[in-house]
Amino acid sequence: MATFYAVEIPFNYRSTCWFCGEPSDKKIKFPQYDYEINILDHLPLTIPSCKECSSIVNRSAFTSIYHYRDAIKKALTKKHQKVLSIGSNWTKKELEESELEGSAFEGFKRSAWPMFEMMQGRINYQGWPLVVNNQLLVVDSDNDSFEFDGVIYVSLDDAVTHAVKTFFLDEALFTRVLSVLGKNKFSQAIRLCRLYPNLTASNREDVFLEILDSIGL
């Protein structure tokens, strides 16, 4: 039977999920199955997790705990896309000053921004440095995160997926425009492509050329 090593937990982080910062419900084994240890780049671990993070990803065959964390972040982003879209469609001030009427809208005004901030915090949370047997766990990572609207996505591709769903973009058009403008102009690409939500293969090329002409390219 394999030995799993407990990570050291700083006093300020006791009872905290290492993956998202919420209160932890349990300590999970990583990887889940002994035979998956063969692909690990570090010792097998036990680590505190909340209920959602411990169950949101079905597989645990990853080369490191950091890649497993990335998978959890991606799953949380997908599951809570509607909550995260609040921060993309509103600012806190806009919500407070909006003239939405009715009990349902009043409830939305009160709860929407705190819900977004809570989920934003969970997605952005990086956990504390992992120490096992007095040794800092150092593993090379090829992760290339991307930040948009205050949320740190695991990758540019995840940010694109979120933007397409949130702003009802034509994905083929958006990714093509983004490739021309570059990821540093992610917001501009969204603004340009929001004008053309429903495209067909026959008119997508014309729209793309129209966008390029509008920005002088």
Task: Please state what every model-predicted region is.
Residues M1-V83:
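N-terminal cysteine/histidine-rich coordination modules
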